[in-house]
């Protein structure tokens, strides 16, 4: 989902170049390294993080309470009452991480799980970018309960539950499909602005980030129609809900937009300094949590609408707060960390 060719290849070339195997190889390294650095943030502004004194910390200051090995590239997370589930598209499976034993247990094997995970109506819902369908599974055992012929539009398209339904964007043009959780059938298809992804349910509405339109789109489940649009930061992508608000991570400038879930009005734009592709945002433990490569954990205080802690270093890509801990994937390290983060 968010794997960087430049990161892995650059590391290989660095080792070879340091060994000075040949002038030609050194020149190749320099050319590719420069290209990768130019492309590493994909044309977005440079990540700077937050420079306020006392906010920034090194990831080396955190010691995991548990480390879960997950083969492949662990990515999307979903929380249940006693565990978390994590996808690994490259390994073609979804793994249950038991929050009591701190060990992985059940494994669901399916082709290229992607585009998020949702918990709702007694099930775990898994979009597949391989079989292009929606898989419904038991959240305790991982047993597959149903396969619904609706596929995600994008590997980062997102999925959510609410109003008796599962919602996911199924075409890049874009179309929001509503799947009835009682019948496992599509009961509505809703046209969205092109380039809209990552639905989330909050209040009485479904909210979707319009990545191309720089807006947060509101859908009314009672009518299955778009009923509002709130201008927010550039290239909005990932959403979470908490404290009566929808929080949006804007990839274009690395800010977080806070939108009132009742009125649809923009309440705050918070500088975070983490622009670029990838990343995620979550709410829990009274805080908003964001992650991107290089800045694995950013903590926002919703009472202040500002970043109060930010950790720099290796790790990151998907984040949740659950069972009294921060759960963080290390996409390139084939593991998930369970962390106790100190109070701000």
Placement of each model-derived feature along the sequence:
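N-terminal secretory signal peptides that target proteins for export/translocation
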Residues: 1-19
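Mature extracytoplasmic/luminal segments of secretory-pathway proteins
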Residues: 3, 14, 31-33, 111
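Low-complexity intrinsically disordered segments
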Residues: 4, 23-24, 288
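Bacterial N-terminal signal peptides
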Residues: 22-33
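Predominantly soluble domains enriched in secretory-pathway, periplasmic, or organellar proteins
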Residues: 36-344
């Amino acid at each position: 989902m968010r794997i960087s060719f430049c990161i892995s290849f650059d590391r290989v070339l660095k080792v070879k170049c340091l060994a000075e195997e040949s002038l030609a190889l050194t020149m190749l390294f320099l050319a590719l390294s420069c290209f990768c650095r130019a492309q590493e943030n994909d044309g977005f502004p440079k990540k700077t993080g937050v420079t306020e004194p006392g906010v920034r910390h090194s990831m080396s200051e955190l010691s995991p309470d548990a480390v879960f090995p997950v083969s492949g590239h662990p990515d999307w997370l979903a929380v249940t009452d006693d565990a978390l589930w994590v996808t690994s598209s490259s390994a073609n499976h979804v793994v249950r991480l038991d929050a009591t034993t701190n060990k992985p247990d059940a494994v669901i094997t399916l082709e290229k799980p992607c585009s998020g995970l949702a918990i709702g109506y007694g099930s775990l819902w898994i979009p597949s970018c391989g079989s292009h369908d929606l898989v419904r599974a038991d959240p305790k055992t991982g047993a597959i309960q149903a396969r619904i012929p609706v596929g995600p539009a994008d590997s980062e398209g997102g999925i959510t539950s609410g109003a008796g339904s599962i919602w996911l964007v199924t075409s890049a043009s874009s179309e929001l499909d509503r799947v009835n959780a009682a019948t496992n059938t599509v009961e509505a298809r809703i046209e969205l602005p092109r380039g809209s992804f990552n639905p989330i349910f909050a209040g009485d509405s479904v909210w979707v980030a319009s990545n191309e339109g720089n807006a947060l789109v509101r859908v009314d489940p009672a009518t299955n129609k778009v009923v509002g649009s709130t201008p927010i930061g550039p290239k909005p992508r990932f959403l979470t809900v908490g404290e009566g608000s929808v929080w949006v991570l804007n990839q274009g400038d690395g800010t977080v937009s806070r939108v009132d879930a009742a009125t649809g009005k923009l309440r705050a734009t918070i500088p975070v300094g983490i622009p670029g592709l990838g990343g995620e945002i979550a709410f829990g433990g009274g805080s908003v949590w964001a992650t991107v490569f290089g800045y694995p954990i950013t903590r926002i205080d919703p009472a202040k609408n500002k970043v109060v802690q930010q950790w720099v270093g290796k790790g990151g890509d998907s984040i949740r707060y659950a069972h009294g801990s921060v759960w963080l994937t290390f996409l390139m390290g084939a593991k998930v960390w369970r962390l106790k983060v100190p109070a701000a």
